[in-house]
């Protein structure tokens, strides 16, 4: 925070469980994929070496589960665990590197407890078969499904303010009848 951070390489060398997440929009990245890329670049700049992409993967999956003491329920794909899964477009053969070089446009599907909550409109039948009621939204000029009503939230904010407000941390694009 504020251009200072702990010596990550030293923590890893000593076997300390290091997790990575989005802390705040003030000092961190706006989403976890951006945070992964930022952490990777920071490590390369700070230490003059690459941080293993597998280590970065663990820093956003199994390590946080251990930190919160929920590793028996979350943090890895295993029988009996909660199926919170992100499916990305495969641009690179190595899955860890693919994750570390992905951005929001790479996200094809997000499952929460095994059910779709966000994804490509090409997966419409999957959303329907799961019983998910999804709203069609635009993020970065791409049509997506989201199991929520961000449009209603944005309309409510616009109505309260009297104008359409762009929120950097909430990249949903919504057309309004009354606001340009």
Language-model regions, residue ranges each:
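Active-site-adjacent C-terminal substructures of enzyme catalytic domains
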Residues: 1-79, 83-93, 101-102
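Active-site microenvironment of metallo-dependent hydrolases
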Residues: 58-180
